Amino acid sequence: MKFFGLFLAILASTAADVVIDGACPDMKAVSKFDMNAYQGTWYEIKKFPVANEANGDCGSVEYTPDNGLLKVRAGHVEDDIEKFVVGVLTKNAGTSDAELTLSVVVGDYVRVAPLWIVSTDYDNYAIGYSCKDYKKSNQHRVNIWILSRTKTLNESSKSTVNKFLKEHSKEFDQSKFVETDFSEKACFFKKSHVYTVPFGA
């Protein structure tokens, strides 16, 4: 489901997700995060695999400001159909950092989960991060997304992203990344509809 998988992945998990021994790593979100500067369209360049994925590609998300929060519309293309979810992205109370909460409507369900932005320049790239601890098994599930304002990262942004990933190589195994297809064929769709099937627990 590509970028659409971002919204499903952080809300549900099965064996295909990246699950690692130990607790979630101690990551730092972007300080003094500017919600208004983050608005607009982002394209998913690559990410860790998502268990909820089907055969979707051409993933993107649009953030629209609304009274201090960001409305969300995230979609992907699958079998010539654009499938999308809607929701809101809000800052957590008591912090100016990019420690965010994502709420997504799926059918009659509203799913809520953390989503941190751990690096961005607002104009070219962003790195989204989510982690869930499984205390009983002493493991954690990690999701990370490399995002761009365009369907390809420019060289400067690519260098910045690669530096971040190198600095966090213990937390993020780069061999786990899968890339998004933005070819004309992958992005072609005849109709669109909202995702309504419940998922997760």
Curated annotation (Swiss-Prot):
<keyword id="KW-0800">Toxin</keyword>
<dbReference type="GO" id="GO:0031409">
    <property type="term" value="F:pigment binding"/>
</dbReference>
<dbReference type="GO" id="GO:0006508">
    <property type="term" value="P:proteolysis"/>
</dbReference>
<dbReference type="GO" id="GO:0090729">
    <property type="term" value="F:toxin activity"/>
</dbReference>
<comment type="similarity">
    <text>Belongs to the calycin superfamily. Lipocalin family.</text>
</comment>
<keyword id="KW-0378">Hydrolase</keyword>
<feature type="disulfide bond">
    <location>
        <begin position="24"/>
        <end position="131"/>
    </location>
</feature>
<dbReference type="InterPro" id="IPR012674">
    <property type="entry name" value="Calycin"/>
</dbReference>
<keyword id="KW-1204">Blood coagulation cascade activating toxin</keyword>
<dbReference type="InterPro" id="IPR003057">
    <property type="entry name" value="Invtbrt_color"/>
</dbReference>
<keyword id="KW-1199">Hemostasis impairing toxin</keyword>
<keyword id="KW-0964">Secreted</keyword>
<dbReference type="InterPro" id="IPR022272">
    <property type="entry name" value="Lipocalin_CS"/>
</dbReference>
<dbReference type="GO" id="GO:0008236">
    <property type="term" value="F:serine-type peptidase activity"/>
</dbReference>
<comment type="subunit">
    <text>Homotetramer.</text>
</comment>
<dbReference type="InterPro" id="IPR022271">
    <property type="entry name" value="Lipocalin_ApoD"/>
</dbReference>
<dbReference type="GO" id="GO:0005576">
    <property type="term" value="C:extracellular region"/>
</dbReference>
<keyword id="KW-0732">Signal</keyword>
<feature type="signal peptide">
    <location>
        <begin position="1"/>
        <end position="16"/>
    </location>
</feature>
<comment type="function">
    <text>Serine protease. Activates thrombin by cleavage of prothrombin. Does not activate factor X. When injected into rats, causes thrombus formation, fibrinogen depletion, uncoagulable blood, decreased platelet count, inhibition of collagen-induced platelet aggregation, leukocyte infiltration in lungs, congestion and hemorrhage in renal glomeruli and necrosis in renal distal tubules.</text>
</comment>
<dbReference type="GO" id="GO:0005737">
    <property type="term" value="C:cytoplasm"/>
</dbReference>
<feature type="disulfide bond">
    <location>
        <begin position="58"/>
        <end position="187"/>
    </location>
</feature>
<keyword id="KW-1015">Disulfide bond</keyword>
<dbReference type="InterPro" id="IPR000566">
    <property type="entry name" value="Lipocln_cytosolic_FA-bd_dom"/>
</dbReference>
<dbReference type="GO" id="GO:0006629">
    <property type="term" value="P:lipid metabolic process"/>
</dbReference>
<keyword id="KW-0645">Protease</keyword>
<dbReference type="GO" id="GO:0016504">
    <property type="term" value="F:peptidase activator activity"/>
</dbReference>
<protein>
    <recommendedName>
        <fullName>Lopap</fullName>
        <ecNumber>3.4.21.-</ecNumber>
    </recommendedName>
</protein>
<dbReference type="Pfam" id="PF00061">
    <property type="entry name" value="Lipocalin"/>
</dbReference>
<dbReference type="GO" id="GO:0000302">
    <property type="term" value="P:response to reactive oxygen species"/>
</dbReference>
<keyword id="KW-0325">Glycoprotein</keyword>
<feature type="glycosylation site" description="N-linked (GlcNAc...) asparagine">
    <location>
        <position position="154"/>
    </location>
</feature>
<keyword id="KW-0655">Prothrombin activator</keyword>
<keyword id="KW-0720">Serine protease</keyword>
